[in-house]
From Swiss-Prot:
UniProt EC number: 3.4.21.75
Record-annotated Peptidase S8 domain positions: 340-654
Organism: Drosophila melanogaster (Fruit fly)
Residue ranges of the TM segments: 119-139, 1014-1034
Protein name: Furin-like protease 1, isoform 1-CRR
Function: Furin is likely to represent the ubiquitous endoprotease activity within constitutive secretory pathways and capable of cleavage at the RX(K/R)R consensus motif.
Length: 1101
């Protein structure tokens, strides 16, 4: 219970200070006063005090000024402790007890107002501080990252003012001293060659000595890109000459079991006394292996997260199960053959397998193995083609790859993939495999802990017997994972491509990934991003990009697979000797590609792994695949980030492979960009340039890698674009909305195949966009070029001037187009454009001359567009006659006017036009002028052609933005200055996904950005200062008011009698001030007085 409080209030006098000090001095003395004739006794006082518990009474006198002297006493426990103070908050005299205190009312009214002001000021200051933090916190992060990299041993970056030095060709680091490393008695290289990136160590521990061994035993090092799991009970051990029984002896001596050989001199050990899942390593067993002189290298394995790239069973399509074929279909009695639309549809709408079968090519003699969760080897549609030598159970360490059955059939994936490749034909059951004459095996490796050793052992299984390895799995497609093969798996790829198939190289085919819905990018998958694999994407039945498909520059080609609910899926074998028509995802695409590869290898057994990739690039069909990102590279090939070079064409690949000459030896050149230590501010981008003129051994590119080290507070905000000397634009990395990692990229090799056939000589540009709120910093950029010194084929014609200014009406490919009789199958096939737009359908009958599926000449009544003949120009194009093109050229000369002979560029006049005031007022007119000024002379224009409209037009009568006749949905025609443009209803910024061409930007964009940034910064500073000033004024005012009030001072109240036995003892207070009339009131009891006026005279003298 709270104590009762009574206040005695008296009118201040001129000697208030003296009275206060006198009261404080007299508080230490004891005064006795017993009131016998008083009407108030001690018992009554105690009773009144009990009734007034938790109440506050005050005594007030009439004020002549704004201040009062108040004594506050606590009487709840009969211990009169009083406080004497002055106050200026009670500004009115309390006339009667029933009235409310005006001071209390004013205080209650002022409190909400004060709280509102405080909240407003806090919100204002908080918003300003947050804005300033967003501007500046990234700089701190960048400084910390720089300091960390410097502390990590990296050399400090050269100052920006230093003169730029030419790029240097990377030289492999010198080998460690012989005293520090063990020497391989066979003279073989270490676990990984120096140029292979170790994904588990970020490239930092490839040749690090550790007690005389290669690599770090027992610790995988720091890897920001790889999320490792628990430790397992298995080890990977390198024992030279272990085949002669030494590996078994080492395992026995240290309590291990030798599970088998991974590849040359590398073995898979297990220790059954070590926990199969542990968060900490088994250091004791690791140390024993390290101390054994027979062991060259040892490492405890950690589990990895690997996902199959298919989906939950979807409902079968309600569309017709039989498609009209435009080629002569073969007769199969398999029950599901009519539903295999991707093989028998014809008309250029399938993968053209039937003509290859008619040539007698069925994959006979080629061995394909499926790396997955097992294979139902006794399936009626698989058992005739099952090959036990191509099969193994890595999870259970036996030769039987039969899957583990459960209630959900979760291990059906491998059996489905195997049926796509080699399901038996004409057995009256289920489906037909693409290579139905090939042998198929399966490796059960996903139904357990997947470690680096498990992957390496699977990829290295019987490489002299197995020709093709098909994998439809990889790191999690969640849009936030950056992961790839470990040290052993990377070595397995190299061993396979250099030694497999008798030195011709094993074929590794990989599914590109199903993270499209999560906006994942397959360049963050180290398996599809590898030069050793053939990455395959998917296309739907209608030729669209599937919703699950990932876009990246490492995808080489495409096969058909599932789409939406209304589109058909893939037919194949299933668990329990059954069949399915609903195989989905890129998991279904990779086995189809493996089957086509088996057909190609049968037609030419001497093909190497690089030969196959060259053939895929040259024969893939872009036709009928709808993707707005289609473009042409520097040698004229059409390529897409979703489909690669197009749909795989089995018959054409077989035809080319029969006459194929082996490509020259692969050459490699690495260029290190100097002084790369740049900060990328938020929502901006920078462009780095690297001049290449030292790679004389690589003149015809195959794979290109940009190895980048970059730090960022949020990795998903980074976009990367690469531009080749031939002006081919490549998107290396797209934004990933789920990637919140702060790890950045540590020597991650972003790979591209889009510059295939180009020359690396010239200027390469790397454009880095930071679309987030935090700073980013790039510290390393290396370019690695793979290719040949001479053309891939002897009859290929070199193209000395590479440019993507390709001829719109012909084919500028660098290789030799093989012409054949136009009466063949391609002469009768229909190349379909946009689905549902009959006016876009080409007219093959109007073509007079064919060359490799491309029309070279149309008749007089037809229009030519993109190597096809049309009766009417397709949508987004307009008819352009030869005389009209010449008139446009003349008009353009008049528009450009005289050229300054002293100008360094013929475009100076157009640049001046682009900086005019009208351009600032209307960007569409500016773009129109730029396009007018950039029109070049048309050379050898066919008589009737279709030219592309401006992208803002749906239909047009010219190439300019001001020549639209109809607009795309969401836009409307508006007339400005006697010209008509298509304006969008709502203009939205596309900065998050647009590619900004720095070469076409003028300085005013940068100036506007800097001006806007400065203004925002000044506004935030002004608001902050105003908030601080207002808050300071309030604090100062409050403190000034507090100084006008004296602090509480203790006044001792002592009993009137020293006797302790009298319970009715009355406590009184002695005041040295003169007696004056005092009224006493209690706030919460208006009908009752605690003290009468004449009674207080005994309390206050």
């Amino acid at each position: 219970m709270k104590n009762d409080v009574v206040r005695w209030s008296r009118q201040p006098t001129s000697n208030t200070t003296n009275s206060s000090s006198s009261s404080r001095s007299d508080s230490n003395s004891t005064h006795k006063h017993r009131s016998k004739s008083n009407k108030l006794n001690a018992r009554q006082l105690g009773s009144n005090a009990a009734r007034s518990c938790q109440q506050r009474s005050s005594v007030a006198t009439t004020l002549e000024d704004e201040q009062q002297t108040i004594i506050e006493c606590d009487i709840g426990n009969f211990n009169f402790d009083c406080n004497l103070f002055k106050t200026s908050f009670l500004t009115q005299h309390k006339q009667k007890r029933s009235g409310k205190s005006s001071s209390k009312s004013k205080s209650n009214r002022s409190r909400p107002l004060a709280k509102t002001k405080a909240v407003f000021l806090l919100a204002l200051q908080f918003s300003a501080v947050v804005f300033l933090c967003n501007i500046n916190v990234g700089f701190v992060a960048g400084s910390v990252a720089t300091a960390a990299s410097s502390a990590g041993g990296s050399s400090p970056a050269a100052p920006s003012s230093a003169p730029s030095s030419p790029p240097t060709v990377a030289v492999p680091p010198p080998p460690p001293p012989s005293s520090a490393l063990k020497v391989d008695p066979n003279g073989q290289s270490p676990v990984l060659p120096p140029y292979v990136l170790d994904y588990e160590t970020g490239g930092k521990a490839k040749l690090t000595p550790n007690n005389g061994k290669f690599g770090q035993s027992g610790s995988s090092g720091s890897n920001n890109n790889h999320i490792v799991g628990h430790y397992t009970h298995t080890w990977a051990v390198h024992i030279p000459n272990g085949d002669n029984g030494m590996a078994d002896a080492v395992a026995k001596d240290h309590g291990f079991v030798n599970l088998g050989k991974i590849f040359d001199d590398h073995y898979h050990f297990a220790h059954h006394k070590v926990s199969k899942r542990s968060l900490s390593p088994a250091t004791h067993h690791q140390t024993r292996l390290d101390d054994d002189d027979r062991v060259h290298w040892a490492k405890q394995q950690r589990a990895k997260s690997r996902s199959k790239r298919d989906f939950i069973r979807m409902r079968p399509s309600r569309t017709s199960s039989r498609a009209m074929s435009m080629v002569d279909a073969m007769s199969f009695n398999d029950s599901k053959w009519p539903q295999m639309w991707y093989l028998n549809r014809g008309g250029g709408l399938d993968m053209n397998v039937i003509p290859a079968w008619k040539m007698g090519i069925t994959g006979k003699g080629v061995v394909v193995t499926i790396l997955d969760d097992g294979l139902e080897s006794d399936h009626p549609d698989i058992q005739d083609n099952y090959d036990p030598k191509a099969s193994y159970d890595v999870n259970s360490h036996d030769d039987d790859p039969m899957p583990h059955y459960d209630m959900t059939d979760s291990n059906r994936h491998g059996t489905r993939c195997a049926g796509e490749v080699a399901a038996t034909a004409n057995n009256s059951f289920c489906a037909v495999g693409i290579a139905y004459g090939a042998s198929v095996g399966g490796v059960r490796m996903l139904d357990g802990d997947v470690t680096d050793a498990v992957e390496a052992r699977s990829l290295s299984l019987n490489p002299q017997h197995i020709d093709i390895y098909s994998a439809s799995w990889g790191p999690d497609d969640d849009g936030k994972t950056v992961d790839g093969p470990g040290e052993l798996a990377s070595r397995a790829f190299i061993e396979g491509t250099t030694k497999g198939r008798g030195g011709k190289g094993s074929i590794f085919i990989w599914a590109s990934g199903n993270g499209g819905r999560e906006q994942d990018n397959c360049n963050c998958d180290g398996y599809t991003n590898s030069i050793w694999t053939l990455s395959i994407s998917s296309a739907t039945e209608e030729g669209h990009v599937p919703w699950y498909s990932e876009k990246c520059s490492s995808t080489l080609a495409t096969t058909y697979s599932s789409g939406g609910q209304g589109e058909k899926q893939v037919v194949t074998t299933d668990l329990h000797h059954s069949c399915t028509v609903s195989h989905t995802g890129t998991s279904a695409s990779a086995p189809l590609a493996a089957g086509i590869a088996a057909l190609v290898l049968q037609s030419n057994q001497n093909l190497t792994w690089r030969d196959l990739q060259h053939i895929v690039v040259r024969t893939a069909k872009p036709a009928n695949l709808k993707d707005p990102s289609w473009s042409r590279n520097g040698v004229g090939r059409r390529v897409s980030h979703s489909f690669g070079y197009g749909l795989m064409d089995a018959a054409e690949m077989v035809r080319v492979a029969r006459n194929w000459k082996a490509v020259p030896e692969q050459q490699r050149c690495e260029i290190n960009a100097p002084h790369v230590d740049k900060v990328i501010p938020p929502r901006t981008h920078i462009t780095l340039q690297l001049t290449v003129n030292h790679c004389r051994s690589v003149n015809y590119l195959e794979h290109v890698q940009a190895k980048i080290t970059l730090t960022s507070q949020r990795r998903g905000d980074i976009q990367l674009f690469l531009r080749s000397p031939a002006n081919t634009s490549v998107t290396l990395l797209t934004p990933r909305i789920h990637d919140n990692s702060r790890s950045g990229f540590n020597q991650w090799p972003f790979m591209s195949v889009h510059t295939w056939g180009e020359s690396p000589q010239g200027n390469w540009q790397l454009e880095i966009h930071n679309e987030g709120r935090y700073m980013a910093q790039i510290t390393q950029w290396d370019m690695i070029f793979y290719g040949t010194e001479t053309p891939a084929q002897p009859d290929d014609v070199a193209n000395p001037s590479q440019s993507n200014q390709f001829n719109l009406y012909g084919n500028d490919m660098a290789h030799n187009d093989v012409e054949y009789d136009s009466t063949g199958q391609w002469r009768n096939m229909q190349q379909v454009g946009e689905v549902g737009m009959t006016r876009d359908h080409s007219n093959t009958a109007a073509c007079l001359k064919w060359s490799d599926r491309k029309c070279l000449e149309c008749n007089d009544s037809a229009y030519m567009f993109e190597d096809q003949c049309y009766d009417v120009c397709p949508v987004h194009t307009y008819p352009l006659d030869k005389f009209q093109a010449e008139e446009d050229e003349q008009d353009d000369e008049v528009t450009r006017g005289p050229v300054n002979p002293y100008s360094s560029s013929p475009m100076d006049h157009s640049l001046l036009m682009s900086n005019s005031l009208d351009d600032k007022q209307d960007p569409l007119q500016a773009e129109d002028r730029r396009r007018r000024s950039s029109l070049t002379q048309l050379v050898e224009v066919p008589s009737r052609v279709c030219a592309a409209c401006d992208r803002s037009c749906l239909e047009c009568y010219g190439a300019l933005a001001s020549q639209c006749s109809t607009c795309s949905p969401g836009s409307q025609l508006r007339k400005i200055l006697n010209e008509t443009f298509c304006y969008a209803y709502v203009v939205r910024s596309t900065g998050m996904a647009s590619v900004v061409d720095i070469s076409k930007m003028d300085d005013r964009d940068t100036q506007q950005y800097m001006t806007g940034t400065t203004v925002l910064l000044l506004v935030s500073v002004i608001f902050t200062l105003m908030g601080v000033a207002v808050a300071g004024g309030i604090v100062y005012h409050r403190r000034a008011m507090a100084r006008s009030n004296e602090l509480y001072s203790r006044v001792s109240l002592v009993p009137g009698d020293e006797s302790d036995s009298d319970e009715d003892e009355l406590f009184t207070a002695h005041f040295p001030a003169r007696k004056s009339g005092v009224n006493i009131y209690r706030d919460e009891a208006p009908s009752e007085k605690i003290f009468e006026e004449d009674e207080i005279s005994h309390l206050v003298p």
